Amino acid sequence: MIQADRLLGPKLIGSFTAIVAVFTAYQLALNFHAYRFAWACWDYMLISANCSFIAAMVLVLSLTRRFDASLRQLRLNNALVMSDDDVAVLKDRTRQRAHTIELLSGLLIGTLVLGSFIFVFGEFIATIWTTLRMNQLPSGGWALAEFGLFVVISVLSAGIAGLFFGRLTRYGMLASVLSDDHERLRVIPGHFDGACGLKPIGDFYLFQAILLAIPILWLGAWWAWIIPQYKGLVCPVTQQPQMLFAEWRGPFFVQWLVVLGYFFMGFVRPFFKLRQRIRATRLSLVRDEAPRLEQEILAGHGREAVLGPAHAARSEDDRERLSRRLWSINTMGDWPMDSATLAKYRSLLLGEVLLPLGAHLLPRIGNLL
């Protein structure tokens, strides 16, 4: 447990992100020195991958703070009835359950990326290994050292990303714990946040979805569009095609599917788990409370004629209160997010999955037509 928390500490993550940034700057300088403005020769795969990792790390450093803030706002919304000690116990219990998931996730993603390098550079690695077994040094020592550094940074970056994927899964598991606790998690019809009081946790899971959009869209763009579209791209300086693009397509597709699994665990599953709780509460209120409210409102109209002015005014106030409660029940939404936010990000959430698939399938559909 402590080990995983230390690995994901802001100092260590910030230091490693700085190393990746320096390496990326070096690659940019190297590409510019070698190719200048011959853009077709640049190593976009490496540069864009590192830039995506840096962007994700900048965002992910606020993950724990956002999670704590979402729980605090739930309590301020009166949607989560917990003391400070209860919240601490909940966090500790969730951390203990998900500790192994985080470590295994880091190992899985790191191994997956390492396996991808072995798959793509298998013959090259075998040649180097054969040369070393013959007690000889392979040629191109500096280039090999640079390649080795690139592989190490890539695998470590993948492992760190995997640890965070596990943490997203851990926070996603919290939705199941909370949604099953009907006494502590309250669904409040007509709440001012527009999401039955659950907007803070819904917004947090949306943030997790945005984080996962970075690797999903990057991997999807490369396997579904960039590699098929530009696999024959020739560098005008060397007169050689861009190397190894086609070989990366299979590994990128597998990685894309794996990250989609984390998207499901870190956003889709908890989001729908909370939606299930909201819908169950609404059905219960519509079945049990709404008919009683209707009867009381209509009965109040009959009593008003025989009441004095003071009692009539009080009866009017009571009917107004009952009407607001009935309206809030009948107009309850389904999602732990207000409608404006949901509409704003719906295209992004669908695009994470549909854009790569569309880019992959459209050329095939065009050929059939």
PLM region spans:
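Transmembrane-helix bundle segments that line or gate the permeation/cavity pathway
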Residues: M1-L185, L206
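Loop-to-transmembrane boundary segments
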Residues: I2-V20, D85-F119, E146-L149, I188-G220, ...
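Conserved structured core elements
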Residues: D68, L283, E352-P356
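Juxtamembrane inter-helical linkers in multi-pass membrane proteins
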Residues: Q73-K91, G172-P200, R279-L307
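Generic multipass alpha-helical transmembrane bundles of integral membrane proteins
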Residues: V120-L274
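Membrane-proximal, solvent-exposed terminal domains/tails of membrane-associated proteins
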Residues: L219-L350, R364
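Juxtamembrane boundary at the C-terminal end of a transmembrane helix
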Residues: A359-L369
